[in-house]
Amino acid sequence: MYPAHLLVLLAVCVSLLGAASIPPQPLNLVQFSYLIQCANHGSRATWHYTDYGCYCGSGGSGTPVDELDRCCQTHDNCYGEAEKKGCYPKMSAYDYYCGGDGPYCRNIRKECQRFVCDCDAIAAKCFARAPYNDANWDIDTETRCQ
């Protein structure tokens, strides 16, 4: 084998190892973002909800700062209930559709998928109804979420 071929083979192997170490985005979180966009008709980008209040985003504690933050707290609690049932809410893929009045779960026979889809659809509709207060985005959770 020629040295150039070995270099190409080595480069391919290294790049494959690097790609394997990148964790995949949990499918459910991608679907949840689509449900949010469906519910609010694209009026607010999904990333606005990732660091809002005390509960929107990763984790959560304290008293929710407003109605939207309560939607996130309820969604977190719903995922907690799903986990108690032995479900993996961040990994449960499901079938849904986007109707004129928001997202709906459809054709779901597996209990975990149905439960998680309902959690997400209810939360997405709650997000769409709740006012968004820019002052509650990226807050200091150490002081405001006690």
From Swiss-Prot:
Cofactor info, note text: Binds 1 Ca(2+) ion.
Pfam families referenced in this protein's UniProt entry, alphabetically: Phospholip_A2_1
Active site: 75, 120
One of the GO BP terms on file: arachidonate secretion
Keywords: Calcium, Disulfide bond, Hemostasis impairing toxin, Hydrolase, Lipid degradation, Lipid metabolism, Metal-binding, Platelet aggregation inhibiting toxin, Secreted, Signal, Toxin
Catalytic activity: a 1,2-diacyl-sn-glycero-3-phosphocholine + H2O = a 1-acyl-sn-glycero-3-phosphocholine + a fatty acid + H(+)
One cellular component term from this protein's GO annotations in UniProt: extracellular region
PROSITE patterns: PA2_ASP, PA2_HIS
Disulfide bonds: 38-98, 54-145, 56-72, 71-126, 78-119, 87-112, 105-117
Signal peptide start and end residues: 1-19
Full protein name: Acidic phospholipase A2 S8-51
Native organism taxonomy: Eukaryota, Metazoa, Chordata, Craniata, Vertebrata
Domain of life assignment: Eukaryota
Classification via CDD domains: PLA2c
